[in-house]
Amino acid sequence: MKRYQKMSRLYAPTLKEDPAEAELVSHKLLLRAGMIRKTAAGLYSYLPLAWRVISKVEDVIRDEMEGIGAQEMMAPIVTPAELWEQSHRLGAYGPELMRLKDRHERDFVLGPTHEETFTDLVRDELRSYKQLPVTLYQIQDKFRDERRPRFGLMRGREFIMKDAYSFSATQESLQECYDDEKAAYARIAERCGVKALPVVADSGQIGGDTSVEFMALADAGEAELVWCDCGFAADTEAATARIAVAEGEAGELERVHTPNAGTIADLSVLLGVEESATRKALALVDGEGRPTVVFVPGDHEMNDCKAENAFGEYHMMTDEELREAGLVKGFIGPVGLPEGIRVCADEALRDSEWWLVGANLANYHYRHAQMGRDFTIPEWVDVVSAKEGDLCPKCGKPMHHARGIEVSQVFQLGTKYSESMGATFADEDGVERPFLMGCYGIGVSRMVSAIVEQHNDENGICWPVCVAPYEVEVVPLNVGDDLVWPEAQRVTDELSAADLEVLLDDRSERPGVKFADADLIGLPWQVILGKRGVKEGKAEVKCRATGERFDVPMDELVSWLSERIVPERA
């Protein structure tokens, strides 16, 4: 990688103001610092500075993958649709999957993930348990036709991803591959300067029954998670918390008039009870078209991802569908529900005996509804989002809530793809068995956004040394000065010769412009050369992350910077 670049020759068109389209800090700063440019919704060009960052992130990934024996390769981004038919994902994936035809009218897809491609690749080659385990990976563009691409590199339609796939003969071997990748992902995040928390996650469309995400903690993160001081953490889409449900009052079933109390908030105020002591009824149509009512604690919300796992591709009932099902909006309860309704409740309510619920009559609720006496729940589901204050399933203490950016995820797929695609090997007894698979993804371009979200201030980006596009910016205050400019060239040459990566601001701009751009681009160290300092044989060195300034003798500058930069490299 080139270690010396002149600012006048660098293609990095900076902006003074935040672009109106940008919402997240990372999106604003990457645009303003001249690192990315939008081509179309969800499609971005990576300009030279950003590409250097991406290259460094990829170098870290390759180093860690080599350390655990994973082998790099490259598969085509275009995949025959028939492979997705074999895995049963072609119809299930939805409109996010970009489909296309070639000139011969053959169907293809643009790969958002490559489980099918890699399974097809090995199924005729890995024939014996003696050849296993094998882990293959690639770093490649992916495409997902997001309905609403936003947040810059955070949720684009085209993105760079490292995806790995392991093939094992036994569960023990799969677990070892999974643990190796999980540990490597933790090291990758740390080496890239990202504080990431491993959290229990939902497997989504990829499948499998075990998954962990690495979440970069950030206030602007799309994902919600809960975590506990004991070390437990989970995405709210997967968290199974112990919810402290307030019990209703015991007594004889009593119908009470609750005019206009069609929401939990209104009911709570009217009857003077905590929202947690009420039961919320949610009416939906499940994936099989059945009218369904699910009861959850009144102070909790249903999680869409969990609901899809429980009910398939569901939708909330419209007013017309409510009327057709004989349900009264805002006053639905388990006592006296119409026939033909699928009735469920969240697991959090399983041990709750006394309920305050709708009476299936406009403007009325039931107090003292007793499970078993007045109603039964035939089906229990896990659909509630965990929230702050819910109890940790591991230690029982209250959990905290945070937001995060998903930068990577690991999955144990089991035989989901190998069985459906007929990918087998011969075991020790010669019996054909499906591969036990794992898959492991890192969002490379998303990692760049996460780094910026965690490393910035009011003036711009503060790149960690490990991933910075360059390590030092030399800023001569007057390039026309016969004393300053030759010294700037000499310092740049010496730093570059010492294996440091240097950006020289050789532009004939005012000092204020140079300082603003230097802070915006955010290289870790700035060497500022003015006439007085050069005369005194000193350089002013600024640490971008802390703002600290140091007067460093010219003859010590190279060693001074090297001592601080080299140990911080990834």
Residues covered by each model-derived region:
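NTP/phosphate- and nucleic-acid-binding module
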Residues: 1-570
